[in-house]
Amino acid sequence: QTCALPILEIVMPQISRTALVPYSAEQMYQLVNDVQSYPQFLPGCTGSRILESTPGQMTAAVDVSKAGISKTFTTRNQLTSNQSILMNLVDGPFKKLIGGWKFTPLSQEACRIEFHLDFEFTNKLIELAFGRVFKELAANMVQAFTVRAKEVYSAR
């Protein structure tokens, strides 16, 4: 009789958040796609810039800083107007980072937003130093955009 060893599967951190919001899919898509405004309202985001942009794709860099730790990561985003934004890592402290946003209309004035992110840091040291900060930031994204929508669209 052989002794089977359990296979240890390395599970990448995953973050999934969903929210129903009283704003249109188009309004929420525009907020999420407005990368240059991120430092104004995203906790931990200290800078952002668009490196390249076409109607269906955008490459953007985001600077994240918290507790004295600063990192920049760049993603290439596939854009489907008012429906989805799919992100793929170009550069940053990750071995892997994929994810995105989906905007599903529920009515003219409401939609469901979904945010999903799979990521793995390049090494344990970076994960120890930056992991909690990044997970916290990513986990609060939907909330931050919901609050931002209220500020931007309720003022109209």
Locate each region found by the language model.
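Glycine-rich portal/gate segments that line the openings of hydrophobic small-molecule binding cavities
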Residues: 49-91, 144, 148
